[in-house]
Design a protein with these regions (language model features):
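A structural "domain/chain start" motif
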Residues: 21-88, 93, 98-101, 106, ...
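Bacterial N-terminal signal peptides
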Residues: 9-16
Length: 308
């Protein structure tokens, strides 16, 4: 009976290991410029400003590896150049396939409203004023999470933020404060934006919780040794195990044009033997046939090796 109980405990422990591994791995995400569907116009681009704020918040959360926005802009520029036919497509990035990032976050600003009532006039002296002005701000965002391999929309979520200030107050004249400036964060609109961004980070983390960590084959040294993207910055460690899948052609609904994903063929298991900051080396106990650069490596399907 004791032997049987030990066997059951061993099995349960082994099953728990992939989940533990997945929990420590950080998915690589990229944030694109937000589309502005409001009438707001300012000195700073609302689309770029919101994307920068979300990028910073995702980085500060510590839950993701966030692709630098300038790198994303460079990739998009390369894609645009490829689509124009001015470079060979074989040597360029494919639209919708950002190899470095697993998830592309796209956003739309649907509401960006600020209303004021009352007056800031009143007693003024030395550049300061005492007034009784009430300000209310509201912002609405639509966030979409896109699989960069297939272009499939994994989730779509609306988030919003509201803030207000009012009553007797003393302060410097802040009329004309522009989005993205130092004084903006202290305004009702700045606070509303922060609320929406914080909600967006929480929603993104929740939606991606059950999405398996994914990396890419970046080099094939032999049929049993390869290099994968990610490395130490994503939490990959020596001894971690993954499953390799070859990626087939993208499947598209002929009627709607909807991206249905790609056929994935399981090739086998690999174990990480060494780790660098941005990539890792892994080996397989048996030959992996037809593995190529760009194939997918997933976590959570094989057991992580236990420490001796």
């Amino acid at each position: 009976m004791r032997l049987r109980n030990l066997s059951i405990i061993s099995i349960l422990a082994a099953l728990a290991l992939p989940a533990a591994q997945a929990a420590t791995l950080k998915k690589i995400v990229a944030v694109s410029r937000f589309e502005n569907k409001t009438s707001w116009q300012g000195q700073v681009s609302l689309g770029d400003g919101m994307a920068d704020q979300l990028t910073d918040a995702l980085m500060q959360s510590g839950q993701f590896v966030v692709m630098e926005r300038q790198t994303l802009k460079d990739v998009v520029s390369e894609q645009d150049l490829a689509n124009s036919g001015r470079v060979q497509k074989a040597a360029s990035a494919q639209t919708g396939k950002l190899v470095s990032a697993q998830i592309l976050v796209k956003g739309t600003v649907t509401e960006f409203e600020s209303q004021s009532s009352g007056s800031e006039n009143g007693v003024g002296f030395g550049g300061f004023r005492i007034g009784n002005k009430k300000e209310e701000a509201h912002i609405g965002l639509m966030i979409r999470l896109i699989d960069t391999t297939t272009g499939e929309v994994l989730a779509s979520q609306r988030v919003e933020g509201k803030a207000a200030s009012g009553g007797m107050k003393v302060g410097a004249n802040v009329s004309g404060v522009q989005f993205g400036t130092a004084g903006f964060d202290k305004t009702p609109m700045g606070k509303a934006v922060q609320m929406a961004i914080d909600d967006a980070v929480s929603q993104i983390a929740a939606k991606l919780k059950d999405v398996p960590f994914q990396a890419r084959v970046i080099k094939v040294n032999s049929d049993s040794e390869l290099l994968i993207s990610g490395g130490a910055k994503t939490g990959i460690a020596e001894g971690d195990s993954f499953t390799v899948f070859s990626v087939g052609e993208s499947l598209v609904d002929p009627t709607t044009g909807e991206q249905l994903g790609s056929e994935l063929t399981k090739k086998g298991a690999i174990k990480v033997t060494s780790v660098e900051e941005k990539y890792a080396k892994a080996k397989s106990d048996s030959p992996l046939k037809d593995i190529k650069v760009g194939d997918i490596v997933k976590a959570g399907e094989v057991v992580k090796s236990a420490a001796p």
